[in-house]
């Protein structure tokens, strides 16, 4: 463990929270570097961090900078991540290389889970998890996020899986891997920009306290892997299912025609969707992350009270 700590650097705020046993909530950084244009990405990141504070927890945005896994970013780190043109998108397979080469890296859902677990952080807020891509039966394009959820003990609060994915297959994969997917005040898997996907959930809860109970019980039973808390985008910010599906289908065709696949597919598709919705999808994306941040903080606080 001593060697591991050589690679981890805590922000002042996060270090203080650790010393005071305050609840901490992790945030990913790919949404900053690859998910949104500047300066909206910085505004979104600072707003989301503040929402977590307002709900009683401490935010820890995670990124790789100069050979260090940063747990919590100072404002200068955030600027580097938001404006640098050479930020690598880091998943599990890339983590050692990016750290060793002292490059700047933004963490995906999978890597944020890994780094959060290294730092003893049990909760992580994101927009949407990755999953099984459309046509995966031919391409085998399945996000490493799903595999990570099966083995890393972090509870992930999200608005379901990104709506560009094959959601029924994503749920089948999570079921095979034994990952609980729990709807928050919903019986249907939310689909990122929309509240409905047509995919029913077997588990649903009404309060953060109930989620805290489940999280702690799972830990005490030594069950390996994470939990997905599926928190739908608020009604007033949701886009209609038919509208967004038509746009996604157009974007998928464009990606195929241009030969864009693998880790480049998601940023390309999300960028195209922003363009085709005239920015409506970007506004929805920001609102759903803010909504997840509030819930994530409430769950972390509820768990802290039970310890």
Where are these regions (language model features)?
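General beta-strand structural signal in soluble alpha/beta enzymes
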Residues: 25-27, 60-64, 105, 123-128, ...
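A C-terminal functional module that forms or caps the active site or interfaces directly
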Residues: 225-288
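Active-site glycine-rich loop that binds ribose-phosphate moieties when present
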Residues: 106-108, 137-150, 154-175, 208-213
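Solvent-exposed alpha-helices and their adjacent loops that cap or buttress functional pockets
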Residues: 16-19, 24-25, 54, 115-118, ...
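Divalent-metal (Mg2+/Mn2+/Ca2+)-assisted nucleotide/phosphate chemistry catalytic cores
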Residues: 74-153
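Anionic-ligand binding region
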Residues: 195-220
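N- or domain-start disorder-to-order transition segments that initiate the globular core
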Residues: 1-21
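Glycine-rich nucleotide/cofactor/substrate-binding loop typically near the N-terminus or early
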Residues: 29, 34-36, 42-97, 220-236, ...
């Amino acid at each position: 463990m001593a060697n591991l700590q050589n690679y981890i650097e805590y922000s002042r705020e996060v270090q203080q929270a650790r010393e005071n046993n305050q609840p901490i909530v992790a945030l990913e950084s790919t949404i900053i570097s690859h998910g949104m244009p500047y300066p909206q990405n910085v505004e979104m990141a600072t707003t989301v961090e503040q929402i977590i504070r307002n709900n009683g927890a401490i935010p820890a945005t995670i990124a790789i900078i100069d050979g260090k896994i940063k747990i919590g970013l100072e404002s200068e780190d955030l600027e580097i991540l938001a404006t640098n043109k050479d930020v690598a998108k880091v998943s599990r397979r890339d983590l050692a290389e990016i750290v060793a080469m002292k490059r700047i890296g933004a963490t995906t859902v999978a890597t944020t889970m890994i780094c959060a677990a290294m730092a003893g952080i049990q909760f992580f807020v994101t927009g949407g998890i990755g999953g099984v891509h459309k046509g995966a039966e031919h391409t085998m394009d399945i996000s490493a996020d799903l595999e990570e959820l099966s083995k890393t003990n972090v509870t992930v609060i999200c608005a379901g899986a990104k709506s560009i994915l094959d959601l029924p297959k994503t749920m089948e994969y999570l079921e095979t891997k034994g990952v609980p997917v729990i709807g928050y005040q919903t019986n249907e898997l939310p689909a990122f920009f929309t509240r409905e996907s047509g995919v029913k959930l077997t588990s649903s809860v009404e309060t953060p306290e109930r989620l805290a109970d489940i999280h702690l019980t799972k830990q005490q039973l030594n069950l390996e892997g994470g939990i997905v808390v599926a928190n739908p985008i608020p009604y007033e910010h949701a886009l209609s299912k038919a509208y967004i599906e038509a746009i996604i289908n157009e974007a998928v065709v464009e990606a195929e025609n241009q030969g864009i696949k693998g880790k480049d597919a998601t940023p390309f598709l999300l960028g195209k969707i922003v363009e085709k919705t005239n920015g409506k999808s970007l506004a929805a994306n920001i609102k759903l992350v803010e909504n997840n941040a509030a819930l994530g903080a409430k769950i972390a606080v509820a768990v802290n009270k039970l310890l």
